[in-house]
């Protein structure tokens, strides 16, 4: 039984939030063009110890994109690797990135590093992947961050138990000493793909049963559970002490298509910005508040309705993508206490 002090009780939750999440109406309706609200930017690194989640966006690095995140009212960014943002950068280049973030008034919350297959069946590729990821952990530390998001690896044809054992061994033997030395943590996103075997609660539990250290956890994304017909709220409770980061993304399911093609077919689901799919955000975010999650909730914008194709490499977001980020923030912040907006 959990200590009564482990979670916020209802009285504390209402006191901090000012209202119950269930009493709030939905926000974030569409508009032809939504102007970025000029929210006063807080200094980079603001409120790192605040006992509630920080809203952020997942983005490639560019000064313009960091500036937009701050102007749009987000508290941080989760940055993906690229030519101008990677473990091979010099100290002076990293100093410039941090200076850019300070100027924008935004905090780099964490980094993503999905490419390495930590348990690649090929010994040479496996060793190279592990060395590459250790550099990512060091890069995280050099940036002053505390978390790296990744995948759990994959071995085609191997059983779930064997893959869990392999991933746990890699973490315990290779990554944990580095994490402890640098005071960082890592976690995998539950995205169903070949090089990411641990995307169900059963697989997650098998891994964690072999890894006592809380420096390995989850980059929890409710949208992926929805399309696997797994309840993300129940999963969040089950792994409450292993949620180190959160992706905010929704899933829309088109039932008429699903009834025709089945779950093995195509076109019956798509990712949406938060609030425009079927994730129960009231229940999910209430779980995060009750377990006192204080990490980053990062909007992972994969909603094609609020985007423009073939623009990801541009230095700034197109207006339609900005609109999606703005709607996502407006929707999510109604459930979170202590917002600046």
Please tell me what each predicted stretch does:
Residues 61-82, 144:
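Catalytic domains of carbohydrate-active enzymes, especially glycoside hydrolases
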Residues 69, 77, 101, 129, ...:
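Conserved, mostly hydrophobic/aromatic
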Residues 1-9:
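N-terminal secretory signal peptides
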Residues 17-19, 23-28, 43, 47, ...:
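Active-site acidic/histidine proton-transfer and metal-coordination neighborhood
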Residues 88, 197-201, 205, 224-294, ...:
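Gly/Pro-rich active-site loop or hairpin
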Residues 53-59, 77-79, 108-113, 148-150, ...:
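Hydrophobic faces of well-ordered beta-strands that scaffold small-molecule active sites
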Residues 29-61, 71-72:
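C-terminal segment of N-terminal export signals and the immediately downstream linker at the start
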Residues 79-98, 155-158:
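Glycine-rich, proline-tolerant flexible connector loops at the mouths of alpha/beta enzymes
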């Amino acid at each position: 039984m959990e200590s009564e002090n482990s979670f916020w009780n209802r009285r504390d939750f209402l006191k901090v939030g000012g209202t119950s999440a269930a009493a709030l109406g939905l926000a974030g309706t569409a508009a032809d063009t939504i102007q970025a609200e000029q929210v006063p930017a807080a200094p980079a690194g603001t409120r790192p110890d605040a006992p509630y989640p920080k809203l952020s966006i997942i983005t490639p690095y560019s000064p313009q994109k960091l500036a937009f995140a701050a102007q749009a009212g987000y508290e941080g960014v989760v940055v993906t690797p690229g030519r101008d943002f990677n473990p091979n950068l010099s100290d002076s280049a990293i100093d410039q990135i941090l200076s850019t973030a300070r100027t924008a008034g935004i905090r780099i919350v964490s980094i993503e590093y999905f490419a390495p297959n930590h348990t690649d069946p090929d010994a040479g590729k496996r060793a190279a992947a592990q060395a590459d990821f250790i550099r990512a952990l060091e890069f995280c530390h050099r940036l002053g961050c505390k978390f790296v998001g990744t995948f759990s690896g994959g071995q085609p044809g191997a059983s779930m138990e064997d893959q869990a054992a392999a991933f746990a061994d890699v973490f315990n033997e290779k990554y944990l000493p580095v994490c402890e030395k640098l005071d960082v943590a890592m976690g995998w996103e539950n995205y169903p793909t070949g090089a990411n075997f641990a995307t169900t609660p059963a697989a997650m539990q098998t891994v964690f049963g072999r890894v006592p250290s809380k420096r390995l956890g989850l980059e929890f994304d409710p949208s992926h559970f929805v399309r696997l017909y797994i309840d993300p709220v129940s999963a969040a409770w089950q792994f409450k002490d292993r949620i180190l980061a959160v992706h905010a993304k929704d899933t829309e399911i088109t039932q008429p298509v699903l009834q025709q093609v089945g779950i093995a077919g195509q076109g019956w689901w798509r990712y949406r910005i938060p609030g425009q799919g079927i994730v129960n955000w009231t229940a999910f975010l209430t779980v995060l508040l009750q377990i006192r999650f204080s990490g980053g909730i990062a909007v992972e914008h994969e909603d094609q309705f609020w985007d423009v194709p073939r623009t990801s490499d541009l230095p700034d977001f197109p207006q339609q993508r900005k609109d999606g980020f703005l709607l996502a923030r407006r929707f999510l912040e109604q459930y979170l206490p202590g917002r600046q907006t």
